[in-house]
Amino acid sequence: MKLWGGRFTENVDELAQAFNASLPFDKRLAMEDLEGSLAHVKMLSKVGVLTEEEGRKIQEGLEGIRKDLQSGKLLIEGDAEDIHSFVETVLIQRIGELGKKLHTGRSRNDQVALDMRLYVRRNSEECRGYLEELLAVIEKLMEKHRRDIMPGFTHLQKAQPTTIAHHFGAYKEMFLRDRSRLLDGEKRMNFSPLGAGAFGGTTYPLDREMVAKELGFTAATENSMDSVSDRDYLIEYLFCLSMISMHLSRLCEEIILWNSNDYGYIRLSDKYSTGSSIMPQKKNPDMAELIRGKTGRVYGNLFSLLTTMKGLPLAYNKDMQEDKEVAFDSMDTLQFCLRVMAKMLDSMEFRLERLRESAKKGFSNATDVADYLVKKGMPFRTAHGVVGELVLYCEKEGKDLEELSLEEYRKFSDLVEEDIYDAISLESCVKNRKTKGAPGSLWD
């Protein structure tokens, strides 16, 4: 059953009908559509637009549809234009003409806006749950490796020694901010658009605040035109998903590097690796590569919706139907990535001796030599220059800083004493950095 057609003299072409239909993808809004319709009917009964008996029968019909969809007895199929048409058609088939009163005081414009807010809100809560699982894995990893030393990098060159706990603490902070962004977005999206109608409200005495409260919203939206014509809450959510994807991708990039033969910092579980069809020795980090690759897909969905919305005049335009496929794809993709990342990380092993030996190379304790000289009374800028000369000397001699003799050190500064060797050991370099947020603050 079509929800329109009275002013048309010809049937819509079959190709155009297929082009216009959204049921194949918006059918996943079925539960939200029913939830919104039930709240709408309760309100219509309360304000007297429907009698108590009418409201009760319609609610029973909607509850029956929900139950049958959940059990699989009713399948979402057929030639309905969208999920709203499908639900209303089934309702009319089941309870007769009374079902035609369901849509009183409502447009599909505010109906779909409501469905999407309900769906996105629920998906955001689920996403936070998967983030929490990943954070729990990271926190467990940090506790286990508080004193396990690894090289820290800038410009992909060894810079200073740090710990595994400190390194992953950076990702913990990123994902905590991601969680905070989701919570903030949920607050902004948590307003009910139902009752906005096509864009200009309705002449029926609707109680929009009742519906908002019934559905767990903070309140009803303030402007009926804005309610149906913007998708900023959805764009913001896709941005949040893109930000999470970016953080996941950065972590995956490091996992891919660390897993390579040249780094050899970690061992990935066989459960989260794949092989080669031609090279029998290969053990590839495909899960990490896929998460990294899917980030571009999530970004693309965000920019697709931004581009769709950028030129639309107020109020509703059918272009906005394009919001769903990109949104659903990003939601599904990101949740999948979070689940895989948590399990992959939880099963990953660190090659601790390899990490420690790597941290010794590349003069990563050079800053600590400079700090040592400063504590002996040398200005930092002078110390910086002296240590630069020391590093150049080491490169020519094929030595590391801790391999220099005291006599060699004193060629560059008379301030150097025997205690230099304790000051520049890996443990000292890490645990003496105790300022808030530094690796030494996690050592004890």
Tell what function each PLM region has:
Residues 1-201, 206-212, 274-275, 286, ...:
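A helix-coil-helix interface module used to build multimeric assemblies
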Residues 53-54, 151, 221, 382, ...:
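A generic structural-conservation signal
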Residues 37, 84, 88, 234-237, ...:
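Short runs of predominantly hydrophobic/aromatic residues within well-ordered alpha helices
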Residues 49-50, 74, 263-264, 379, ...:
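Conserved hydrophobic residue
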